[in-house]
């Protein structure tokens, strides 16, 4: 048992793991391979034995011995000071941590120093439960215990101060409750897209498509995923071909992509982050091969700096199954790709409207990027009627136009 990854006393690599020098070497090795290192910052709470508890009790939400007697699971006595355990407003407190007071000016200054130190050791930071520090959320959670509400937001104070010394470091918000845009306005470069995940799990294709109608200035800064440390394993949540379809959506939509440890080989057992062991699970070789092909494909510049377009699609008076289909294109110079996904349990058909005005008077080869099947289509028909597609449940096209 590793203990809690959120119960942080100090942001320094343990000596038995090599200390800061080992982290610096690991970062250099990653950078040499074209990778960047992202570290975690937990802003909402710290370990009960954090030095601030004794040196700066004013940095925390405090209580009384009456509070402790009344709600012993909500408060803790730390050498004569009663502090609130960390929490979010919808769940019981976390018993291994104490709650910082995000409204306290001293705490904000100390957090800036802490994050500046972290930023010197990495290329980006994932900020745990970042929305809990927003003034509205914090005030609603802690009310009078928090004291006077500041005129500025926590992240508006912290992020610019850190970037003044480390301008290239990325800030990534773990975000819930549809607060992604507000966190972006507070300075975050990227935010988790939990809403798309929920739509893929629970909703239909029209819901997913509606989500993707947002402006690209917003979508480009979302982190798309179908699995992370909090959610159940994708292989357990998206049975059979549904995972393939969901993965194609997440990988080929605008924005950053998060692939979680064990997702590629199809692990199904969700593990607490406190454990350093896991049960043996046979790898899903077919799924792993699919992910390797998909990730190699989306590594191309086309899917990062190309022009993305959400496609219209239509059906026929006696066939409305086009509602089960989502489609979009990417274009960069002469390169162009169409992605079509059937997000349903039903065989579905549609005509997909393409955004390109130079299709006429050409014959086009449509090559399946992920399996190299090839189709030949007339450009006049593509321009006038759109591309006819017919897909089995949870199947997709990933078509390169030549």
Task: State what each model feature region is.
Residues 1-402:
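Active-site and adjacent substrate-binding regions of carbohydrate-active enzymes
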């Amino acid at each position: 048992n590793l203990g809690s990854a959120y119960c942080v006393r100090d942001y320094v690599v343990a000596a038995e793991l090599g200390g800061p020098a080992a982290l610096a070497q690991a970062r250099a090795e990653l950078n040499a391979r074209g990778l960047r290192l992202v570290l975690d910052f937990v802003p909402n709470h710290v370990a009960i034995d954090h030095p601030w508890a004794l040196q700066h009790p004013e940095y925390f939400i405090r209580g009384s011995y009456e509070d402790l007697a009344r709600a012993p699971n909500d408060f803790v006595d730390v050498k004569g000071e009663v502090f609130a355990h960390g929490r979010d407003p919808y769940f019981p407190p976390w018993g291994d941590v104490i709650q910082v007071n995000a409204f306290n000016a001293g705490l904000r200054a100390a957090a800036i120093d802490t994050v500046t130190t972290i930023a010197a050791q990495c290329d980006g930071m994932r900020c745990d439960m970042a929305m809990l520090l927003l003034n509205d959320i914090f005030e609603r959670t802690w009310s009078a215990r928090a004291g006077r509400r500041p005129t500025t937001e926590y992240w508006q104070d912290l992020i610019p101060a850190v970037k003044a010394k480390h301008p290239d470091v990325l800030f990534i918000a773990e975000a819930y409750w549809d607060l992604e845009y507000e966190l972006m306005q507070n300075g975050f470069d990227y935010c988790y897209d939990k809403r798309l995940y929920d739509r893929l799990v629970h909703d239909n294709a029209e819901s997913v498509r509606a989500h993707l109608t947002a402006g690209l200035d917003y979508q480009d800064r979302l982190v798309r995923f179908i699995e992370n440390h909090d959610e159940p394993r994708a292989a357990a949540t998206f049975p059979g071909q549904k995972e393939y379809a969901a993965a194609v959506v997440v990988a080929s939509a605008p924005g950053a992509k998060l692939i979680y440890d064990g997702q590629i080989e199809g692990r199904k057992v969700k593990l607490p982050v406190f454990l350093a062991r896991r049960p043996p699970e046979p790898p899903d070789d077919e799924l792993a091969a699919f992910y390797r092909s998909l990730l190699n494909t989306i590594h191309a510049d086309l899917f990062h700096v190309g022009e993305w377009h959400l496609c219209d699609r239509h059906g026929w008076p006696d066939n409305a199954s086009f509602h089960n289909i989502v489609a979009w294109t990417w274009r960069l110079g002469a390169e162009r790709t169409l992605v079509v996904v059937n997000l349903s349990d039903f065989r579905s058909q549609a005509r997909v409207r393409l955004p390109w005005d130079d299709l006429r008077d050409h014959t086009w080869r449509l090559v399946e990027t992920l399996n190299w099947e090839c189709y030949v289509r007339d450009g006049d028909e593509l321009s006038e009627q759109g591309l006819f597609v017919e897909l089995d449940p949870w199947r997709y096209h990933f078509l390169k136009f030549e």
